[in-house]
Amino acid sequence: LPLLDKDTGQATERAQAVIDVFPEQYQVEYRQGMARKLGLAGFEDGDEVLASDLLALMAQERTDFTLAFRRLADLAQPGTGQQIGELFEFSDAFTPWLQRWNQRTSGDPQSASERQAMMYRASPAFIPRNHLVEAAINSAEADGDYAPFNQLVDLLGQPHDFRQDLARFAYPPRPDQVVTQTFCGT
């Protein structure tokens, strides 16, 4: 609070004013971000349900969110784009939701290629997965080998550009690779 104002009362008021508008601002940003991930020009009535149903289904099916959103972008214009279908496919449980999504996007004003490009920009193919970060740190720390770290940094410099030759970096960890405690203690 002292950074906001020397007067504690004024600082508290200023901080509270920011806190008061946060929920609304968060909702606006969330809706815009989710619209991009779903390939929608904007959120309309029912889109919040479409989004929340997808997230619930992904959680229920224990789906990797990163791969699922990338695969959804592939489906925006099948047979084109960066296609990660061999890395991930939706289970049959997603069929009804995908039908709803197809119906919703068919009425959107943008072309399939515009939709797909927007979705790719909103959903990285590669993220700094804990098991990859830990392996890179261990390699550097134990062996003095910074090559895995440098490769990961290079890859994450362009996380939205899927490259088949680097597909191994897109996979979630196998059970034996799950990191239960990171170097920072989380």
What residue ranges belong to the model's regions?
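Regulatory N- and C-terminal appendages and interdomain linkers associated
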Residues: 2-186
